């Protein structure tokens, strides 16, 4: 079937989004063209500006259009000396939504993966080490994902902290709130048992 080259180009471009296959891309393209051209224009403008203007924070490496992001620039976020290490900027948004953390962050943009040729410098651990040397850090909270690579990355950073006398802690993993034990996998349940705490009345 012969279709508009621009329409084909739009559908192919939409497929760069995660979870969007040919059918989803086709549906999105037709929806924008048929029902929401103004929405499509706003999307195009927002994408163009974001791609051109959003870079990385000079301190924590999260996404920002400024040299230093709002969190790193906030003096109150520096008071407790805590830095939470995460794998991606999306993790910062997740933690910020809890309202439970008032320190700063460091974004790895990935995790250690020797099989894929990703070493310490590739995820910015050289820059993190510089911060351990130059800043007054009371605690590094390791919030990497609970995967094999995430655990290996957390262990590597913990060893780095030990060299500089900085306390390192790992976020707890375990049974989700509202979950049922019979539905939880063995590895998660093992983490829950190992990370149990006393009930204080």
Swiss-Prot record:
Gene Ontology annotations of biological process type: DNA recombination; DNA repair
Signal peptide residues on this chain, from the entry's feature table: none
Record has Mitochondrion as a keyword: no
GO MF annotations, alphabetized: DNA binding; zinc ion binding
InterPro entries for the chain: DNA_Rcmb_RecR (IPR000093), Rcmb_RecR (IPR023627), Rcmb_RecR_Znf (IPR015967), TOPRIM_dom (IPR006171), TOPRIM_RecR (IPR034137)
Zinc finger (C4-type): 57-72
Superkingdom assignment: Bacteria
Pfam families reported in the protein's UniProt record: RecR_C, RecR_HhH, RecR_ZnF, Toprim_4
Entry keyword set: DNA damage, DNA recombination, DNA repair, Metal-binding, Zinc, Zinc-finger
Domain Toprim: 81-176
CDD domains: TOPRIM_recR
Job of this protein: May play a role in DNA repair. It seems to be involved in an RecBC-independent recombinational process of DNA repair. It may act with RecF and RecO.
Family: Belongs to the RecR family.
NCBIfam families, sorted: recR (TIGR00615)
Name of the protein described by the UniProt record: Recombination protein RecR
Organism: Salmonella arizonae (strain ATCC BAA-731 / CDC346-86 / RSK2980)
Lineage: Bacteria, Pseudomonadati, Pseudomonadota, Gammaproteobacteria, Enterobacterales
């Amino acid at each position: 079937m012969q279709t508009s080259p621009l329409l084909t180009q739009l559908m192919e471009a939409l497929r760069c989004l995660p979870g969007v296959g040919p059918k989803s891309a086709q549906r999105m393209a037709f929806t924008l063209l048929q029902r929401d051209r103004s929405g499509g224009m706003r999307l195009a403008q927002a994408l163009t500006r974001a791609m051109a203007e959003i870079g990385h924070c000079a301190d924590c490496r999260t996404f920002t259009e400024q040299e230093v992001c709002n969190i790193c620039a906030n003096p109150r976020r520096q008071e407790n000396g805590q830095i939470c290490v995460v794998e991606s900027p999306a993790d910062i948004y997740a933690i910020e939504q809890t309202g439970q953390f008032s320190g700063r962050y460091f974004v790895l943009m990935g995790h250690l993966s020797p099989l894929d040729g990703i070493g310490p410098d590739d995820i910015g651990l050289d820059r993190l080490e510089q911060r351990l040397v130059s800043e007054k850090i009371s605690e590094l909270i390791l919030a990497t994902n609970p995967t094999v690579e995430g655990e290996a990355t957390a262990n590597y950073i913990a060893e780095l902290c030990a060299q500089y006398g900085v306390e390192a802690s790992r976020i707890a993993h375990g049974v989700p709130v509202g979950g049922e034990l019979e539905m939880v996998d063995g590895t998660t349940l093992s983490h829950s048992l190992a990370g149990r705490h006393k009930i204080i009345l």
